[in-house]
Amino acid sequence: GIGMTADTSKETVRIEKDITGYIITEKGRYRFQSDSFLYLLKDNTYVLAGRVVMKGEEMNLLCDKLVIFSSNNEVDKVDATGKVRLISKGTIAKSEKAVYHFKDDRIVLTEGPKILKNNVEMEGESIMYNISNGKFFINKPKTRIEK
């Protein structure tokens, strides 16, 4: 990244633009890109904002803001908000919010979630993506077929 600022009184580290990097977890390696990066030392939380892309082996996650929560050098969960797109094996899931629960190996999309596969669009109250088996589960689904 370009333009690093550390604020010792607020215990933050900020990088202004062109952020690229990766995180390694027991679940795999994830590359990320964003327009800005903020690390909150007290909370052990990372905030990526702007055009955020997080790429894993089985899926890509795109959004406006990504907050990574960690403890004991392990990622606990990731909150994605704003124009969330989860792309995996030809399926695209969209919503305004998604939470990646690392220990459960699942991502839950809420706030207007939709899923598109083979020109079939489904909506639901929430959509869960199981990373281990690559399957999507739609809670209270509604279907629309595109021609």
Where are the model-predicted features located?
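Mature-chain termini and adjacent capping regions
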Residues: 1-147
